[in-house]
């Protein structure tokens, strides 16, 4: 994290530690995360507190908050990188990677792949059976293969 990002996280933490206790509870955490551009669900908040709140106090101190947000921001960065890669494939901007898109990229990269191999790649990632790979399917397969 940059110093600026750390400062942003500190400011969000202080802003939502409304009673100045040095800790934030579940309700305060939800508001703090929204301020940083996340839309956490109630279950996510509960899980985050449970994962971080080692002493069982039901609240999070700044160090715990910083660790959690650092991980979250890393996730967001890798998602942005994956979406950039997606857009390189989706040159016709349909929001999906077609067989034709994949074939073009393979050719540009000098990969000698058969049509069957390319189709297998599409089939592996294609969850909804429409014969193409949408953003979510692409994200999922990239995460699954640990390329990001």
From Swiss-Prot:
SMART domains: EFh (SM00054)
Chain ranges of the EF-hand domain: 4-39, 40-75, 77-112, 113-148
The entry's keywords: Calcium, Cell cycle, Cell division, Metal-binding, Mitosis, Repeat
Protein residues bound to Ca(2+) 2: 53, 55, 57, 59, 64
Biological processes per GO annotation: cell division
GO (cellular component) term, any one: myosin II complex
Family from the record: Belongs to the centrin family.
The protein's name in its UniProt record: Caltractin
Organism of this sequence: Tetraselmis striata
């Amino acid at each position: 994290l940059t110093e600026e990002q750390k400062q942003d996280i500190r400011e969000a933490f202080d802003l939502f530690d409304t009673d100045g206790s040095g800790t934030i509870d579940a309700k305060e955490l939800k508001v703090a995360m929204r301020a940083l551009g996340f839309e956490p669900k109630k279950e996510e908040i509960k899980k985050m507190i449970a994962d971080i709140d080692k002493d069982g106090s039901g609240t999070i101190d700044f160090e715990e908050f910083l660790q959690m947000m650092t991980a979250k921001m890393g996730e967001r960065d890798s998602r942005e990188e994956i979406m950039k890669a997606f857009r390189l494939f989706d040159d016709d901007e349909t929001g999906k990677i077609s067989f034709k898109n994949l074939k073009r990229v393979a050719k540009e990269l000098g990969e000698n792949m058969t049509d069957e191999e390319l189709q297998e790649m599409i089939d592996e990632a294609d969850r909804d059976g429409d014969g193409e790979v949408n953003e979510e399917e692409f994200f999922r397969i990239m995460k699954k293969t640990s390329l990001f």
